[in-house]
């Protein structure tokens, strides 16, 4: 257990989170990480040995900023978050697959899912740290790589909104069937996080196999 993070995750109102995910495809949660934990994660950005790859976003026309992929082994806090958050998100992912007429295929625990990824040659860890300066941004995109991927992503804010930076809202664009797209601009407080769907989801009020998609920035 990393400074009680397991207990904090277990204490979340998961029934409310599942309801939000089903209704709108994302769920915003108040601070889960403490200020000192956020500071510790920010400080890691300058520790070269922790990362396997650095991406200059402007070089690839992804936006303006940069991010770094962690290499194995992951920092204990990040590993603990992955292991504790995955099971409930897997429940939601399987529920949505069934509503779309597909077989529930996500294991109940993280390790069997990672083993499934490894069997498909997907062995590199994907958690990352992003860094933006004034004027930085991330273009709309969907993060789905390889034959096996998990349909949810979780993002944490590590700085203080309106103190360390201004703006910086997280943009989700919902692509709805037979309707115009709808945007959601979400401000995340320090230590808070956002769960969001990055692939097809069933649409409330429509036939079970009707889908909507989300694009992120």
What are these regions (language model features)?
Residues 138-145:
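Histidine-centered catalytic micro-motifs
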């Amino acid at each position: 257990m990393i400074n009680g993070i397991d207990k904090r995750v277990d204490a979340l109102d998961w029934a409310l989170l599942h309801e939000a995910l089903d209704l709108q495809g994302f769920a915003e949660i108040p601070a889960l990480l403490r200020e000192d934990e956020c500071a510790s994660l920010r400080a890691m950005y300058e520790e070269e040995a922790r990362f396997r790859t650095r991406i200059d976003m402007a070089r690839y026309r992804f936006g303006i900023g940069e991010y770094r992929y962690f290499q194995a082994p992951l920092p204990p806090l990040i590993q603990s978050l992955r292991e504790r958050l995955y099971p409930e998100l897997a429940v939601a992912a399987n529920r949505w697959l069934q509503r779309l007429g597909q077989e529930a295929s996500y294991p109940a625990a993280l390790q069997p899912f990672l083993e499934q990824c490894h069997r498909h040659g997907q062995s590199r860890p994907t958690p990352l740290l992003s860094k933006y300066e004034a004027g930085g941004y991330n273009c709309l995109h969907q993060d789905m790589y390889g034959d096996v991927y998990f349909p949810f992503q979780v993002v944490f804010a590590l700085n203080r909104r309106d103190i360390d930076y201004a703006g910086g809202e997280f943009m989700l664009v919902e692509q709805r069937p037979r309707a115009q797209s709808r945007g959601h601009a979400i401000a995340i407080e320090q230590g808070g996080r956002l769960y969001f769907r990055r692939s097809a989801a069933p649409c409330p009020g429509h036939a079970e196999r009707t889908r909507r998609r989300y694009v992120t920035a």
